[in-house]
Amino acid sequence: MQDRLRILEDLNMLYIRQMALSLEDTELQRKLDHEIRMREGACKLLAACSQREQALEATKSLLVCNSRILSYMGELQRRKEAQVLGKTGRRPSDSVQPPERSPCRGRVCISDLRIPLMWKDTEYFKNKGDLHRWAVFLLLQLGEQIQDTEMVLVDRTLTDISFQNNAIFAEAGPDFELRLELYGACVEEEGALAGAPKRLATKLSSSLGRSSGKRVRASLDSAGGSGNSPILLPTPAVGGPRYHLLAHTTLTLAAVQDGFRTHDLTLTSHEENPAWLPLYGSMCCRLVAQPLCMTQPTASGTLRVQQAGELQSGTLVHGVLKGTNLFCYWRSEDADSGQEPLFTILINKETRVRAGELEQAPEWPFTLSISNRYGDDEVTNTLQVQSRDALQSWMEALWQLFLDMSQWKHCCDEVMKIETPAPRKPPQALAKQGSLYHEMAIEPLEDIAAVTDILAQREGTRLEPPPPWLAMFTDQPALRSSCSPASVPTWTQPLPWGRPRTFSLDAVPADHSLGPSRSVAPLPPQRSPQSRGFYSKSQLSTWLQSPV
């Protein structure tokens, strides 16, 4: 059965790739290939996980990849249908109609996500019962775009679930639907004993005794074959932990507000579910939207503006239409440098625009009148351009702005602030390997040399040179009986016999340095062998006179 499912899955992936190639959409094809590779890596990681937390992260990645692949499949299907309908529905005799005007796209950002919990008083206040933990995360989908939050561990000590991520969706229309899905899984192993290997079952039965061990062994064997047991929990699902959909909701343009707001959740879990959480049934978040017409200029050019009440021919300015304002600058460089405009003409949903021509002004014959009502008064500003094409471009930009304002509604009243999402925290670095001594910087103190001398004197009284008859069986020459300084071994030469000397870690020879990454103490001052207590003449003579 597993082989059949794997074959069908491979065929589906091949079909998706072929569909993407037929549409010649390199961007969508690149995204799809990336998610397929991520899915394969998540499957391999899940099979190699040994810790419960690692398996939860791998299962979360696999769930997100599957959701994105399904979303891209739906988008590919829609584009394929549109391509087929476009080829079959068009006739050579049909006249080419201009495309319908559509509202601009925008960015949607959701942040400050909070989901309150409703614990029982015996669990939260009296702290009674078993302490269970759950792993939860949010899956956010807007069109074909899917994002996820970090995995959060929840127990009864928390009053709400807090997600610190800011999810930004680009290329969103005013009719967007942002779906939020809350998934959860129990952190504790479910049915760990039921899925235990036979080796563990044998050890368990032998430790409990003959009669009790046989009953436990029979229970383990029956649970492994049938999937249930009268005394043990059911076996977990094959392939790792399983996330359950706990709640979901859908947010639209009506939920956009430049502030904190509460929304209802649709609960889909029950208390018998192992991943059940006592959700309050609502969530709090900040949902904002930025139409492109509010953040990017839609038209610009040279204008001659005659403000209301002016009797002169007007002022020559550089006009920039951005958002609901027509900014007028002295020069185009002032607009690029961000300087304050000379004056601003307001444009809102009640603004009236009228085009005309002036015969007495041959250089600026085309006019564009913008009228706004303030109370009972009506203020009209007249714009003059030099060509009909310039007049047409300004009229197109204003018509598009009116359409955007009618579709995006209150999002065009003022520019809502979108904070840049902070990067996710990288995994904690592993601790440095090595002893604590190698991580410490030891200062050169005089006490270190004194301690080294004491240790050397103690070890020197215990050391004995090798006997002379040992030279007959080894290649080492016998020790000369002369007590000259050359016959006394130094501490840098290893002795061929006896227990090796133990020196202080502070006195490390220069040719045995610990490397540049380890801090060691400087060498103690050199002293004579006699003062350090290595050997004495009395000790040597006593050794020569002692029997073998």
UniProtKB/Swiss-Prot annotation:
Q: Which domain of life is it from?
A: Eukaryota
- What SMART domains does its record include? Hr1, PH
Q: Which residue range or ranges hold the REM-1 domain? A: 10-85
Query: What Gene Ontology molecular function terms does this protein carry?
Result: GTP binding; GTPase inhibitor activity; small GTPase binding
Q: Which cysteines are joined by disulfide bonds?
A: none
Its quaternary organisation is: Interacts via its C-terminal region with the TAX1BP3 PDZ domain. This interaction facilitates Rho-mediated activation of the c-Fos serum response element (SRE). Interacts with SEPT9. Specifically binds to GTP-bound RHOA, RHOB and RHOC and inhibits their GTPase activity.
- Name of this protein: Rhotekin
What is the native source organism of this protein? Answer: Rattus norvegicus
